[in-house]
Design a protein with these regions (language model features):
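Phosphate/ribose-recognition catalytic cores of enzymes acting on nucleotide-derived substrates
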Residues: 2, 183-223
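Nucleotidyltransferase catalytic core that binds NTPs
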Residues: 1-186, 197, 216
Length: 223
């Protein structure tokens, strides 16, 4: 997320970062409970990067209505891939994004392309609701072995982290999504999906109990 902040700083006079682990985006309580939290470390990193403002709100402030008012997008886009395996996730995501937009009132809003389906839904919501905010998608930041950076990576053991590097490698090299599924399963990954859409190869897998997602830009898919 620091790369999103850096991009925002380059393109704007003021940058606002927000940290909020949104319970409404988790369809499993266990996943919410175990989601990595490092507030003090995050604050120190944002201070070092000289972010102008950090917005920290609790659930009672974000949801004074106890989550009774929600944003539902009803097309196929919000029913497939991530939505199929994480019911309610995109409802919670769109709802909290809209709330923060009304609080901050930004000129631009920045999102990572690793969550590509999420990015498309956000763009669609902004257009449908006439939100005068520019949506900026930012390239995925990766470790030296190609694994997309994610807070969930911290939950991987050393052995699992080594194995996880095969995830993006296979997505990049496999001739088809079906071949990618077979190769990932042969290495012991539990595969939720691999799909070629929007010029990208989108995928979600488990390494042990840790769920990883990716959305690689594949040039031959864009032609």
């Amino acid at each position: 997320h620091l790369s999103l902040c850096a991009r925002a700083q380059q393109e704007n006079e003021l940058t606002v970062a927000a940290i909020f682990v949104n319970a409404s985006q988790f369809n499993q309580t266990e996943d919410f409970v175990h989601y990595p939290r490092s507030l003090e470390e995050d604050q120190a990193l944002l201070e070092k990067q000289k972010i102008d403002y950090l917005l920290l709100l609790d659930a009672e402030t974000v949801y004074p209505d106890n989550y009774q008012v929600q944003i539902h997008e009803t097309s196929k886009l919000s029913k497939e891939l991530e939505a199929k395996f994480r019911p309610g996730h995109f409802i919670g995501m769109l709802t909290v994004v809209l709330k923060y937009l009304h609080i901050v009132k930004p000129t631009r809003s920045y999102y990572g392309e690793k969550d590509y389906q999420q990015l498309l839904l956000i763009k669609k919501m902004f257009q449908a609701l006439f939100l005068e905010v520019e949506v900026v998608g930012c390239p995925t930041v990766r470790a030296s072995d190609g694994l997309a950076l994610s807070s969930r990576n911290s939950r991987l053991t050393a052995q699992q982290r080594e194995k996880a590097a095969y995830f993006p490698a296979i997505l990049n090299q496999a001739a088809t999504s079906e071949v990618a599924v077979q190769q990932l399963e042969n290495l012991g990954f539990k595969v939720d999906y691999v799909a070629d859409q929007w010029g990208r190869r989108l995928a979600a897998v488990y390494v042990g109990e840790v769920r990883l997602i990716d959305a690689l830009l594949i040039p031959q898919l864009a032609t």
